[in-house]
């Protein structure tokens, strides 16, 4: 393990692509965990805690490993070399690339537009709630 501290955003992609894995032993319940997503977009497996956003972003045994115990961490770190980095990057790009996220946002905005076509006050006047 080599901790280098903060790095510039320009150097981050190259650094993550060349990393064996990203370790995310956070004690914070991450609501999204951008660091894990960034690593996986580069094809780098993630070894992380098994709560918060990690349960949704790190597919166990495919994109990395989620850990409960010290032994889980040891096993996960030792097993990352068995994961296919191209598969990790492909799945991550399908889920979190700008294009993929943009399509989901577009769908949500279109749904909101349809729902509130007559304005925000329409629901209030009909007694409906959002």
Where are these regions (language model features)?
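Nucleotide-activated donor-binding/catalytic signature segment of Leloir-type glycosyltransferases, i.e.
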Residues: 1-10
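Short alpha-helical segment that forms part of, or immediately flanks, the ligand-binding pocket
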Residues: 13, 36-41, 55-56
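Acidic donor-binding loop of glycosyltransferase active sites
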Residues: 17-31
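Short glycine/acidic-rich beta->alpha loop that forms part of the nucleotide-sugar donor binding site
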Residues: 30-33, 40, 50
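Short hydrophobic beta-strand element within catalytic cores of glycosyltransferases
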Residues: 45-48
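Short acidic/histidine- and often glycine-rich active-site loop of Leloir-type glycosyltransferases
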Residues: 50-61, 65-66
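C-terminal "capping" alpha-helix adjacent to the active site of nucleotide-linked donor transferases
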Residues: 65-86
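A charged, aromatic-enriched C-terminal amphipathic alpha-helix characteristic of glycosyltransferases
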Residues: 82-129
């Amino acid at each position: 393990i080599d901790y280098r501290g903060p790095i510039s955003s320009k150097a981050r992609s190259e650094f993550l692509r060349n990393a064996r894995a990203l370790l995310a032993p956070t004690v914070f319940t991450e609501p999204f965990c951008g660091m894990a997503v960034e690593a996986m977009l580069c094809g780098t497996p993630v070894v992380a805690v098994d709560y918060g956003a990690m349960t949704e972003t790190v597919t166990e045994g495919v994109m990395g490993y989620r850990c409960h115990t010290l032994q889980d961490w040891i096993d996960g770190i030792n097993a990352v070399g068995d994961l296919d980095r191209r598969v990790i990057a492909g799945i991550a790009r399908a889920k979190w690339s700008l294009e993929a996220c943009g399509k989901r946002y577009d769908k949500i905005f279109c749904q909101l537009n349809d729902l509130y076509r007559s304005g925000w006050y329409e629901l209030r006047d009909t007694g409906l709630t959002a």
